[in-house]
Amino acid sequence: MTADIRKLVHAVPFVPFTIHLADGGQLRVPTVDHIAVPPGGGRVFVFGDDERYDVLSALLISRITVDRESATSSHG
């Protein structure tokens, strides 16, 4: 799953997406500045607009959804 997230992070243009967790939680990633995926791939860091951040185990990520509205509008 981290490989999929890396592809989204490096996409040009960046398209916002949501990470869905196994426990039903979800975290929105509105910009590339709101996420970091270290080289090891076992964890994902998602940053809020405030000083808050979440450290996720990649094993707990159940799916990723791309913001279709942003994806459509970015292509003109």
Segments (PLM) and residue ranges:
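Motif-centric detector for short Cys/His coordination patterns
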Residues: M1-G76
